[in-house]
């Protein structure tokens, strides 16, 4: 066996290993979301629903608040309040909130004044909002998010009202993006879907590791018992994923994927804006628990390996039909599982783009990773 044959054999073995790992993730984990059976319609009576505090942090969000706040304030729910933290806004956010407070008795405003000597991130605003909250159950969303229905609040917190509600501390929801024309919009939606496929599937498998602040519920008592965001208080990001990563367990976490539980946000309109947003979001991943880093690292390493090692096999003259055949096994499995999961999350129009975005997302995250090696500070707003 000459050197080329030895190298080819090694590359082929690694390629096969990456393929096997990918298939295992799809069959063992991702299929759980794809074929998940939810509880159907809400079985808990409205009178049995616990009081809820919705928390929204807003910095210069006047435009979005005017579009979406009313839909939050008028949810079909017996007892709830909406706490909006006006975090150092210099637009007309304050004036608009004052007007809305006169119209809605369930609106509570917390105002933070800017201090030149002290800069803070979203965690301070969120902490003050939670301190001002009157109720035990907290539902977090963002100023640029719109509930998908008037039953959003009922559906997201129904797990806190069932027979086993005492054991529930977290409910993870889906923060979707509105459908817009163009490749960027579809890529953002695919990236959001792929992230949700992971954190929902792993939660269903007994390994919850993150949630998104656009649609996340947890107990106020849990927040204060943990002394807020704990050891991550000084980090700019991580108000959602790191908090869940610290405290979520197989028994205290539920997911909600009924369409009425979704929130909808407008996607970024330029690649630069999306790049900055994602750069901030992924900066917290290195602080996840070791088992979660290994779990995600293995997934992404095998994902990269499929493309890189497949290319190397073609480069050394290996039979392209075998490479394409093996890659097709993964692609067919991926398309079936993702297709069903996309149908569950109302993203089925993305199915034709799976193979395209599957590759470009890898390139995008590679650039993000390199960028974050040289940028240590990120801004919330």
Language model regions located:
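N-terminal membrane-anchoring/stem segments of glycan-assembly enzymes
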Residues: 1-46, 372
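Membrane-embedded multi-pass helical conduit in multi-pass membrane proteins
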Residues: 31, 299-377
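Short, well-formed alpha-helical segments that are part of the catalytic scaffolds
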Residues: 35-40, 61-74
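Cell-envelope/extracellular polymer assembly enzymes that use nucleotide-activated donors
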Residues: 50-53, 81
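Acidic donor-binding segment of Leloir-type glycosyltransferases
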Residues: 69-115
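Acidic donor-binding/catalytic loop of UDP-sugar-dependent glycosyltransferases
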Residues: 92, 143-159
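Short aromatic/hydrophobic "clamp" motif used to bind/position activated sugar donors
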Residues: 138
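Catalytic donor/gating beta->alpha subdomain of glycosyltransferases that bind UDP-sugars
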Residues: 160, 168-196, 221-224, 228-292
